[in-house]
Curated annotation (Swiss-Prot):
Binding-site positions, Zn(2+): 54, 62, 71, 74
Source organism per UniProt: Drosophila busckii
Keywords on record: Antioxidant, Copper, Cytoplasm, Disulfide bond, Metal-binding, Oxidoreductase, Zinc
Residues at which Cu cation binds: 37, 39, 54, 111
Gene symbol of the encoding locus: Sod1
Catalytic activity: 2 superoxide + 2 H(+) = H2O2 + O2
Protein name: Superoxide dismutase [Cu-Zn]
Classification of source organism: Eukaryota, Metazoa, Ecdysozoa, Arthropoda, Hexapoda
Subunit field text: Homodimer.
């Protein structure tokens, strides 16, 4: 992840039927919640803005990770303590590293503000979670481990 927020995040999935484990660390975050999403395009030519909207191949509304009606890329929030790196530890059953809806080649984005999980009543709640500016992003690639 590069930008005002920086870090390394790993996406692991043992098989198509298993959830994706998302782990890593992000630095440069103010204390509090920060929206954490997979966006549609693996394009950072104009910084994080070129990554497009949240990855949403099923055309659903924005929601919480536990909601049935959510973008595939809606991974909720990560919590920064303000003391050192922010740990990322997410297990998600909707995203995948396999098939047509794979997130490989797309962009993970960290936002400046909390994701209201589609429940904030703001005009952006049902599209972006009103999570604010994109302060860090990186293309999801394949790593040799």
């Amino acid at each position: 992840i590069n930008g005002d927020a920086k870090g390394t995040v790993f996406f692991e999935q043992e098989s198509e039927k298993c959830p994706v484990k998302v782990t890593g660390e992000v630095t440069g975050l103010a204390k509090g919640l920060h929206g954490f999403h997979v966006h549609e395009f693996g394009d950072n030519t104009n910084g994080c803005m070129s990554s497009g909207p949240h990855f949403n191949p099923q055309g659903k509304e924005h929601g919480a990770p536990t909601d049935e009606n959510r973008h595939l890329g809606d991974l909720g929030n990560i919590t920064a303590t303000g003391d050192g790196p922010t740990a990322v530890d997410i297990c998600d059953c909707k995203i995948t590293l396999f098939g047509a809806n794979s997130i490989i080649g797309r962009t993970v984005v960290v936002h400046a503000d909390p994701d209201d999980l589609g429940k904030g009543g703001h005009e952006l709640s049902k599209t972006t979670g009103n999570a604010g500016a994109r302060i860090g992003c990186g293309v999801i690639g394949i790593a040799k481990i």
